[in-house]
Amino acid sequence: MVDNLTHLKQLEAESIHIIREVAAEFDNPVMLYSIGKDSAVMLHLARKAFFPGKLPFPVMHVDTQWKFQEMYRFRDKMVEEMGLELITHVNPEGVAQGINPFTHGSSKHTDIMKTQGLKQALDKHGFDAAFGGARRDEEKSRAKERVYSFRDSKHRWDPKNQRPELWNIYNGKVNKGESIRVFPLSNWTELDIWQYIYLEGIPIVPLYFAAEREVIEKNGTLIMIDDERILEHLSDEEKARIVKKKVRFRTLGCYPLTGAVESEAETLTDIIQEMLLTRTSERQGRVIDHDGAGSMEDKKRQGYF
């Protein structure tokens, strides 16, 4: 029967199986919602998995307070339209310290507001499994991670201590205090994601589509002027270099750490055509991926998603 399914339908069936398996195996799962395209697809698959019922778990957004304003508006709209149970968590210690990507740099900002914030939220609510939208084709450390990614009592990942996954059989047994991160989209590619969004009519943040936007080039990266806070950290000379360009985003994160790409892709079909021709990674614009050699793996070892 599998042979009769299209490539995307096979991926869909695999992801739905994983989501249902986790819901059946674990006591208190949660779905992380970063508001990006992969989260949109994962949420769509989860709703399909349990239709016509509601999701048997909440969705959670670990908020750094530096996402694009359009992302916040989109999140609130989706939560209202879908009737989701949303948990938001902001690291109170980071807020008290005034942590931001300009003053403290991308590495410290990411560690405190994302990694430590995520660990706080998981501990606070006692979640034993957390769904995430990471894919193996995104980055080399993610390429070697299992669908069920086991974490110790401090949420750390040990790439040398992973369980074998045979076909579609997943071992979810964990000791007290341990947990897993689950990646239902592990075998999807960026092109698969876009084709599925197109076929299923999944709503996404408009930032993925090309439009005239104010940007400034910093260290070879086009940073969008999303709100007034960024202007406080620019010199007069830098402010003079702010220009309007037709750009879009292939990946979304904290706006001062996420680079735009010049593009003419205004529709989903345009984006798919662009994906067929591009030879660069979608994460080339993520500043946190360039903090140092092996930086993503180091972050994941400390509990980053």
Curated annotation (Swiss-Prot):
It is an enzyme of class 2 (transferase). InterPro entries: PAPS_reduct_dom (IPR002500), Rossmann-like_a/b/a_fold (IPR014729), SO4_adenylTrfase_ssu (IPR011784), Sulfate_adenylyltrnsfr_sub2 (IPR050128). It comes from the Bacteria. Its EC number is 2.7.7.4. Transmembrane segments: none annotated. Keywords: ATP-binding, Nucleotide-binding, Nucleotidyltransferase, Transferase. One of its GO terms (biological process) is sulfate assimilation. It catalyses: sulfate + ATP + H(+) = adenosine 5'-phosphosulfate + diphosphate. Gene3D superfamilies: HUPs. CDD domains: Sulfate_adenylyltransferase_2. Heterodimer composed of CysD, the smaller subunit, and CysN. Belongs to the PAPS reductase family. CysD subfamily. This is Sulfate adenylyltransferase subunit 2. It comes from Pseudomonas entomophila (strain L48).
